[in-house]
């Protein structure tokens, strides 16, 4: 079982006035234990030299490159294992209760790996 907490972000203008406030629920994944709370956590990343080489090859061959961002990427992918989360204050009548997560949450050790697996499955679909 993993605890959760709220993370708050405030955006301010030039005078320091708050113009936007956000909050998100994150898992306190640093308390997860390998082999008990999660299995594999490896997710490949692209080095900056690989990105430069890819860009140079695309320019030389006059190819188009596409770059995209995925909003809330980690919370798009399903978990492979059962993860139970204790809800923090600020969750109304769920405070203190334990819930089972269906999808990943920021802060989980396996979030990067599950997102990578989800992305690969989407890219391998015929209509991509």
Give the label of every model feature segment.
Residues 1-128:
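Long, low-complexity, charge-biased intrinsically disordered regions
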């Amino acid at each position: 079982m993993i605890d959760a907490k709220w993370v708050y972000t405030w955006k301010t203008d030039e005078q320091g006035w708050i113009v936007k406030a956000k909050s998100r629920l994150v898992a306190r994944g640093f308390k997860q234990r390998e082999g008990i709370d999660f299995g594999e956590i490896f997710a490949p990343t692209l080095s900056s030299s690989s990105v430069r080489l890819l860009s140079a090859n695309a320019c030389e061959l006059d190819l188009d490159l596409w770059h995209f961002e995925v909003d809330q990427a980690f919370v798009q992918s399903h978990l492979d294992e059962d993860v139970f989360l204790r809800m923090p204050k600020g969750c109304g009548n769920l405070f203190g209760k334990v819930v089972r997560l269906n999808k990943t949450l920021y802060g989980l050790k396996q979030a990067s790996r599950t997102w990578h697996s989800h992305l690969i499955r989407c890219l391998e679909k015929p209509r991509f």
